[in-house]
Each structure stands twice: as C-alpha cells, then as structure tokens.
UniProtKB/Swiss-Prot annotation:
Superkingdom, natural source: Eukaryota
GO terms under biological process: hyaluronan metabolic process; uterus development
Carbohydrate attachment residues: N97, N127, N136, N231, N508, N776, N795, N862
Name recorded for this polypeptide: Inter-alpha-trypsin inhibitor heavy chain H5
Gene (UniProt): Itih5
Organism: Mus musculus
Amino acid sequence: MLLLLGLCLGLPLFSESQEEARSWDDTSEQVVLRVPRQLRLLQRLKTKPLMAEFSVKSTIISRYAFTTVSCRMLNRASEDQEAEFQMQIPESAFITNFTMLIGDSVYRGEITQKDKKSSESVKDKRNRTSDDNEENGSDMFKASLVIPSKDKAAFFLSYEELLQRRLGKYEHSISVRPQQLVGRLTVEVDILERSGITSLEVLPLHNSRKKGSGKAEGDVGPPPSTLINQNETFAKVIFKPTVVQQAKIAQNGILGDFIVRYDVEREQNIGDIQVLNGYFVHYFAPKNLPPLPKNVVFVLDISASMVGAKLQQTREALVTILNDLRPQDRFNIIGFSNRIKMWKDHLLPVTPDNIRNGKIYMYHLSPTGGTDINGALQAAIKLLNNYVAQNDIEDRSVSLIIFLTDGKPTFGETNTLKILSNTKEATRGQICIFTVGIGDDVDFKLLEKLSLENCGLTRRVHEEDKAGAQLIGFYDEIRTPLLSDIRIDYPPDVVEHATKTLFPNYFNGSEIVIAGKMVDKKFDQLHVEVTASNSKKFVILKRDIPVEFRKMGNDVSVTPGSARDGGKDLNHIERLWSYLTVKELLSSWRQSNSEQEKEQLRQKAQDLALNYHFLTPFTSMKLRKPGLRTNQLEDTYGMSAATGPATVVQNLREAGKQPEPDLKKTYDPRIKISKTSVDGDPHFVVDFPLSKLTVCFNIDGEPGDILRLVSDHLNSGVTVNGELIGAPAPPNGHKKQRTYFRTITILINRPERSYLEITPSRVILDGGDRLVLPCNQSVVVGSRGLEVSVSANANITVVIQGNIAFVILIHLYKNPAPFQRDHLGFYIANSRGLSDNCHGLLGQFLNQDAKLVGAPEEYGKNLSNQPFPRAEGMPEAILKVKGRRVPVVWKQRKIYNGQAQVDCWFDRNNAAKLIDGVYKDYLASHPFDTESALGLSTPRKPETDRPHEESV
C-alpha cells in the first residue's frame, strides 16, 4: 500500500517551541555520546530531521491484533526541512487512524467515502512500492511534511489485522525500519489468548532484502535487548535496543522485521468458540487426522525470461517437493512457454522410479519462447478432470494445481478476463489453483485472481530472496490436506449474519475462522454443527456452546477513538467480525463480473468500512484540522497506548472497563467532588469526615507568593504549589487587596519525574515529552501513570497512579471588574494515595481529626455541622485540632463556582493555631520547589504582625 501524503506546513509545533527544541537537542546530544565514534560522523552528515522516538505497540486479543506506530521528529537545522514517515504494514491489515502533529494543530485522519477528486485524500492503492526495503506480504505507508526550523512533529498510525495460522503457528511481524538510529526505540507486543498459549518464540530480525540488515547467517534466538514475560494466557514481549545495539544491527536504522510467533491450546472437537456482547468468533483447526490423498499438477514457466537463477532455484525447490509426496498421491509435471510440454498424458502414482524420472524431466526443460498461461492451465485442469472421471476413487482426494510463472501472458489467449473465465469454467469448483509469482515483472493481479476464484492461495517470491526456500515454505502450507468440503452451520434464528461457512479444503497447520453477529443477546447457548469429508468417511461434529453475556476476565473491550460513533464500546470480536466481513465483500467484488452486483458489494463494503473506520479500496482518508476538540487526545499523545480509532485497549487482565470522561459535565464523572479545597481569594475548606466537621479559613498572602498546598514529596512523590496574583480590593471593602491563584504546579517524582503547570489559559504537561494544551478545548491525555482531563473553560482533572485525584477549577471573566482576575481553584478529590506524613496548607489535614470541645448553647445541633444557623454573628466555639484549641465561628461558604454550599467552622485569625507553624513556613522559593513544607517538631507561636482580618 503506497499512501503518500504531502503537507508543506510552516507552523510552530507548540508555544515555546524554541525552548522545547533546545531540550530535545539536549536529549539528542546524550544519544550521540552513546554512539561509537565511527558513527558520529555519519550522524553529523545527515540533513534530514532527527527521529527522537520510534515506538510500536501491538495488542493481540484472540488472534486479532491492534497495532499503533508513534514517531516523533525534530528539525535541528536553521532552515525548514521535509520529514518523511514510512511504515511497512501487513498486506492484510486495515489502517484505522492516522494523525499528524505540527504547530498547535492536530491533523486527524477521517475515514470517508472515496472521493477521487479530493486532493487531500489518502488513498488505499494496494500497490507495492519498488523500495529496497519492501518485503513480501507487506504494503508501504508514507507521509511527509515540512518541519519548521528548530521545531518538531509527530506521526501516529494505527492498523488492525487478523493473524493467520500457517504451519501450526501464528506470526505477528512488525517492521522496524526508522531509516536512522533512534534515541528511544521501543517495540511492545502484548498477547492475550484465553484458551492458553502453548508456545512462544521471538525470531531473529528478518531483513533479507536490505543491505544494512543485521541478521547474520546462523542468527538464532531473539534480537538483543528483547524481554519476554509469559504466563498461561498472557505474554508481553518488549524490544528496546539502545543506540549502540541498533548500530551493531544496522547503521542505517533499517533493523528489519521483529517477528513474534506463537500457538494456542485448542480443543480436538468443534474448535474454540468465543461469544461477547452479541458477536461470536469460531476458530476451527482440527489435528491428528489422516491426510487426504492429493492429485497435484506442477505447472512450471519455462519461457525465455526464466533463464538463469530463477529456473535453477525453482527446479531445486520442486525436487524437494517431489521427495515429500506421499505414496497415496498422484502427480504430473507441465512445462510451458509458447508451447505446452507435458511430461505424461495422465497422472502418475508416487513411486521411487516416477519421482526420479520426474526430476530428470524437469532438468531437461530449457527456457525459450513466450508465455501461454491459458494453455498451460487448461492442460493441467484437463489432466485432473480426466483422472477423477476415469478412476473409481474409493478414497476422497483433493485436486491441486501449483502454478509458477515470472511474467505476463504473451502467447495464445492474452486477455486476462478471458483467461479467468476459461479457468473458472474448466475447474467447476473442483480444483484449487495455488499460484506463485516470481520476480517483479509478474502479473500478480492475474495470479491473485486465479487463486481467489479457484479456492487457492497466491504468493510473491523475489528472485534474490532465496526463491527456492520460499517456494518450499509455500508448499509446506498445503502439503497435508486433512478435510474437504467443510460446512459449518449455526441456527438461523440465533445468528443474523456469519462470514463464510463453506470451505473446499482444510490443510494441516492452518485455521478456519468464522465470525458472526447474533440476532438476540438473550439466549443460553449457540448450536454449532460441522460436516466435512476425511479420506473414506464423512465427519459430523455437533456441540451446544453456553453463552454468558458478561465481562469475562480474559475479554477486553476496545473503545473507539472517535466521537462520531457516539462513544459506544466495540469489543474485539465485533471488530474481528467487521474485518472479516469487509474482506469477504472485497473478495466477492473482485470476483464478480456483474456491474450491478459489484456496485451492491461495493456499497456494503463501504458502509461497513465507514462504520468501523477501516481504510479500504472503497474508502479514503482525509486529514482535517479540527483543533484539540475530542476527549481522546491520549490516542494521539499517549505513547504507551494503542492509539487511534478502535485501538484504546483497556486493562488486559481486569474484567471491568473504566468509563470515559463525559465532557458535557463540568467535571470528570469518575471524580467525586471533595469539600477539601482552596478557591477564590483564597478561601480554604477542610473536610473532617470522621467528625462530620468542616473547617474553613483564609490566607491573606502577597502577590507573587507561592504557597505549598500539598507536600508529600518523600512518600507518594507528589507536591502541589500555588502562585498568587494580586488585584485591587472592591470599593468599600475591608481589605486593601485581593489575591488569587494564577498558577497551580503539580510535581510528581514517582515512578518517573513529571510535572503539570496549570494556568487559566493552558496546561503544560512534561512527562518526558513536553506538551502544551489550551484550556478552551476539551482533551484527555495520559503519560506515565498520569491522566489529565481538560473540560473546556471549566476545569482540569488530574489523576495520578489511579489513587490520587485533583480538580482545578477555571474562573474566567468576559468583562472583569478592576478587582477581578482570571484565576484557579484547587480541590482534592481523592487522597488515598497520599501518605500519612503528607503536609502543606491542605495536605496536613487529610489524615487528621477535629473535635468541638466547647460551644455556646445557641449552636444546638450545629455540633454535627448539619443545621442552618439561627442568626449571623454567633459567639465563638472551640475546635480542638492536633491538641491545639482554636477559636472558630459557624459560617456558610459556597464552593465549586457556587454550585455547592458548605457549613463550616471558620478560623478568623488567618489560620493561626489551626495550621502547623505560620504562614511563612508554607512559602516555596519557586513553583518547582519540592522541599518539605515544614521542618518543625513542635508548633510555633502564631505570628502577631500578620493581619487577622476576616474575609468572606
């Protein structure tokens, strides 16, 4: 697939990009220090942008793989430079999302109906490139843009595929070809198979067609720096080579294919059937059955273009294949150019003499003349039809043609449509044709359609890629047919739609996969019936599968990354069903010769692809610049998450799925709003839930003061500082000035250091990569156990490691009065992760208790802090906190933008005696100061020179 996207944009990537670029420079210089001296000159000579990070994350759930590629680039040059992102993806995969970051904009790929006139469309051409690094069975995705000087850009690509079982194993291949050495290179593969993982191996890097390949002859075992963790149903594989390790593999950054191969535990009988939320998948792969006899004709191109290594390697491969034929098989050999050279006029049994004579015949075939593909196929089909018609075959057998060519039809019938129709008419659905295209000049589309229409498979073999070995490998996939005429039935009153259920053959080591959509979710079981032929008998298998509609521990829900689908949850089985259905519609469309039928198939495939965000030949991808509007920005920035539509995979080991933020509300619905907060000028509220008491106080600070609100740096690693801004006091007020929080800084040093700097207009998140988010657009981002949810112009919710949560309220004024300032409020929503030693103006009360020890009779039931006051100006009560007696009065105070009202005991004395120490003890030297908030072993006396004014 060649997907070429060119954007010449000259926007700054983020605000303060010069400073960020310098920080990236520092990182890249550290990378250079780790590179061997002989490689430094090579890096200096590069004129293309530096790739700072290349990350691939694959999550495989019951053979269905979600893969996301993330790439970050930096232009260190003094002029604009073009950056190209390219990624080989499996030929069978569907792209589901592509996103680019440049300037302050996020360019998201939107799957739309195919519009040939649109110049912005990214088309699914399904054409292979001529690039040197193109591998068999893969397509190339390319995108390019111009990065301004000293700026950076990022690319994010997501795709999905169903892994096919070949030779008894599933193989997941990831292209690791960043084209340069990368400071941070990571490949991570998670495998979840509820039936159990029986074998798992990581192969050496495979890159046979590239000069820079690090795969040496005799390489065995996984690549260096590969880590494998596995239990019965789950496996995690991580490949994280250093720059030095990359250089030893390939100095040009073309490392090759990272391949994970595995198999699963399977039932001997009906197969593995999984049901989830109205959809099912059926994996059928029987074993330990006697093989069916084969009737096979080898058809070999001996035209002039096959001279040399191609013909020699093909002969050697066929010698190996002939040696592998079983005694019950029948075979023949045809060589063709512009003449059809048939070894014998009938099929021969497999005997030592016949095998020897067949080899001799092959070696006497000499290349000459043109290419009569139609004539060769008709001769082979006639041999097989005659054998079946003339022999009373007791054993059921499978008729196969293995057809090898390196070119296009040049002699006899050359019209491809006529060749296809002639072949289909002659085979009558009874003969399977397996085609092999050798070299780059072959008419691969013709071979592909020949196999597609005649129950076969096709392979492309590059002549410089050990063609003989590839041919033998292809034959190994079909050498052992176990069943024929397979039919799998499900009750029509239960299953609304199922993918293909009729299969001509089943070969040992492969797998039949059927997915279906059920009529109704309210039933207890799914009846499955399999009928097939095996040698001398029919095989009938029946079973009722219990259906439990629940969130199973080994099932994983997948959440689309687009608001267009209304936020509905799509499970992996539903996506597998849609994937197979689209594939089958495309296959039927290619085979159809009726324009009306083709249009109907095209429309069905297009509608399904649009619904599930698949890039197909009937859909296109348009890049839109909507700004940061959706609540799925973690799909763009989250390097460790599977990103893009339909690839945000939830916790692989837990059954529950966390709800997503509802941006229509003014706060994250997962977060319960707490009374413990500081807001306004600044008004502090502290909740003591055990005592059913709420205490409030004011701090009259100075503009520029930085207050320590939460200090738990040595334990949980969290510190929160707030910087004050000044404003004139309102007319006739009792205060000389007001102060508000203009900046809240949250610092985290576990598990890795990161910080958040929040103002009413923006959020700066530095979790390894610096990210600037505007507060006027709703987004959700995640990094290193930190989740930040911005609800536009309303609030920011910060969740740390799942057990600490803060809500920062945004106060904005359209037409502010002189005494008003845009400012922030800070609320502690979840403090479970903070330690008992937590301190700060708010933090010191989180694990404390308070008690009213003396109050006048006028308060009555107000000791429980529930009733309303009888009147204002009530006398003082005494509150006991940490052994200190604090005079307080009862008051009502509004919090959370006036949406809630709390009854609290108010300390009028600027928190004297209530807090440990005095106000100055809570002043930080700068916003990123993490020193202990208070170094006192005993309380100090309150300051006497601070104003003790009450402000409400």
